Amino acid sequence: MTTKTHSGSGLLSGKIAVIHGGGGAIGGAAALAFAEEGARVFLAGRTRARLDEVAERVRAVGGEVEVDVVDALEPKAVEAHAERVVVRAGRIDVVLNALGLAHVQGKSFAEQTLDEFATPVIGYTRAHFIIAKAASRFMIRQGGGVILALSTPGSVLPGPGFMGYGVACAALEAMTRHLAGELGAHGVRAVCLRADAIPEALARSHSRAVFAEVAARHGLTPEAMLAAHAERNTLLRRLPTLQQVAQAAAFFASERACASTGVIVNLTCGSQVD
């Protein structure tokens, strides 16, 4: 990303942004994009070292960032963190759920156990409910805010081996629409970014372990599998980058997207067409 000098004219100038999963690939990229657009960023996640690494990158581009270790699956921990953010910064304008959870992909329905199916469905929906509820309490009081989620084209494209995660992504998109309906009268927007697989994310997210089993069944590495997918299955013959997804998050968190709520943003490079 390009380093900016903060002049108060960024898309998110003066905004307070909370990122859960802030130590991950997408969360870290979003932290940089938000900071470059003028937001004060609060990173939350389970691994302090990874959060600190992202925070150093944010500070290197002149951003203001704070770090807290938070388990997004624990309501009291997330609520307490939201309260601390408001004490420190006065408000919460944006919350991004960029959480990644380990789960099984690549097994056929016949092979998959109930727990393997349920783990991503329960984990991802639980986390988003907890995160959105904690932030929305303050957004309602202040008369506005933006709740951002992430999903994948698995939400709408069926295929063998992806049932649990596909259902989880569909549920996150449904939650986005219902949050928009619940909170719109209070000026709170809800947006979900539907991105296809991001090759760069293999380096610092749970996706390498998830894709490894799928790729191995085809005698491929995760990198080779994604390259083949990009060539065969996307209209643009490529997959999205971390920067592209992060910049989309910054835009939809900003006032320039103030007419958008309950929307699922297609960032699939054409692997799925609306």
Residue ranges and their predicted role:
Residues T2-S7, G106, R237-R238, A249, ...:
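Short C-terminal tail/terminal secondary-structure segment
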Residues I16, G23-A25:
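Conserved glycine-rich cofactor-binding loop
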Residues A39-E53:
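Conserved glycine-rich Rossmann-like NAD(P)H-binding loop of the short-chain dehydrogenase/reductase
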Residues E79, G100-A118, R141, G161-G164:
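Conserved mid-core segment of classical short-chain dehydrogenase/reductases
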Residues E83, I122-R141, A180-G181, A185, ...:
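Amphipathic alpha-helical dimer-interface segment in Rossmann-like NAD(P)H-dependent oxidoreductases
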Residues L101, L148-A171, T176-A185, R194-L202, ...:
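Catalytic loop of short-chain dehydrogenase/reductase
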Residues A110-I130, G144, L148, L172:
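Catalytic Tyr-X3-Lys loop
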Residues G184, R189, A259-G262:
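Short, small/polar-rich loop/turn modules that mediate ligand/substrate recognition or access, typified
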